């Protein structure tokens, strides 16, 4: 029969999976938003859900630390959970930032560079894989997420060069900067996915 402590750790596991699923959802929605889908309010609502879930998990972690005496491995799991939810919360914030930028992009009929769409797909994949790595305790998947970040960084650098050239030609400066910031937020989301993968790896150190 599971102890109260074991049940709390299992609840922590379930809550992180739930928060991770919300992050996957909000990133997929932001990807749709930059393509013109009418889902901006849904992004904002999902970001609020992520914020609420972060507070719930923080409270659970504090209860575990205050009322239990976790051994080293369990303590690592709780510490990693606190780091992971911080990164997940930032993913929600950056998806909301992308949603804000997508309003101007859509209203002004700005053409989205193909590479931004590809970058969005890469970051969606990284977030999904980082959550899957946690669920499956898969260290190989953690390493894949970390390696994939190089491709996202390369794509961001290419986008910077492409937008600089387009702005030099005839692209409106504000439109160019909004597209650049959209790509920058995606690059940061990739960084947060890497942080989550690293937290998962830390949890399962022997």
Predicted regions and their residues:
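A positional/architectural concept
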Residues: 2, 7-9, 13-51, 58-59, ...
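Amphipathic, well-ordered alpha-helical segments in soluble domains
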Residues: 19-29, 53-60, 94-98, 122, ...
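Secondary-structure edge/capping motif, primarily at the C-terminal ends of alpha-helices
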Residues: 27-37, 61-68, 99-106, 130-137, ...
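Conserved amphipathic alpha-helical segments that form helical-bundle/coiled-coil interaction surfaces
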Residues: 39-63, 77-80, 129-163
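Hydrophobic/aromatic-rich structural module bridging two neighboring secondary-structure elements via a short loop
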Residues: 63-86
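A cross-kingdom feature marking solvent-exposed beta-strand/loop segments within repeated
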Residues: 67-74, 108-114, 171-174
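A structural feature that tracks compact, well-ordered secondary-structure segments
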Residues: 85-103, 130-131, 142-146, 153-160, ...
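Conserved small/polar residues in nucleotide/adenosyl-binding loops
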Residues: 203-206
């Amino acid at each position: 029969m599971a102890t109260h402590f074991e049940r709390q750790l299992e609840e922590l596991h379930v809550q992180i999976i739930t928060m991770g699923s919300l992050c996957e959802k909000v990133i997929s929605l932001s990807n749709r938003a930059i393509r013109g889908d009418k889902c901006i309010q849904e992004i904002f609502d999902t970001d609020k859900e992520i914020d609420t879930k972060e507070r719930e998990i923080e409270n659970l972690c504090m209860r575990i630390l205050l009322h239990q005496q976790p051994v080293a491995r369990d303590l690592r799991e709780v510490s990693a959970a606190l780091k992971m939810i911080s990164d997940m919360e930032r993913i929600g914030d950056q998806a909301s930032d992308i949603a804000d930028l997508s309003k101007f992009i859509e209203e002004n009929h700005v053409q989205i560079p193909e590479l931004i769409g590809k970058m969005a797909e890469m970051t969606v994949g990284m977030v999904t894989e980082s959550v899957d790595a946690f669920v499956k305790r898969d260290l190989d998947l953690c390493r894949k997420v970390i390696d994939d970040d190089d491709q996202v960084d390369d794509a961001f650098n290419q986008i910077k060069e492409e937008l600089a050239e387009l702005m030099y030609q005839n692209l409106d400066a504000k439109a160019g900067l909004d597209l650049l910031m959209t790509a920058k937020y995606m690059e940061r989301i990739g960084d947060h996915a890497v942080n989550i993968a690293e937290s998962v790896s830390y949890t399962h150190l022997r």
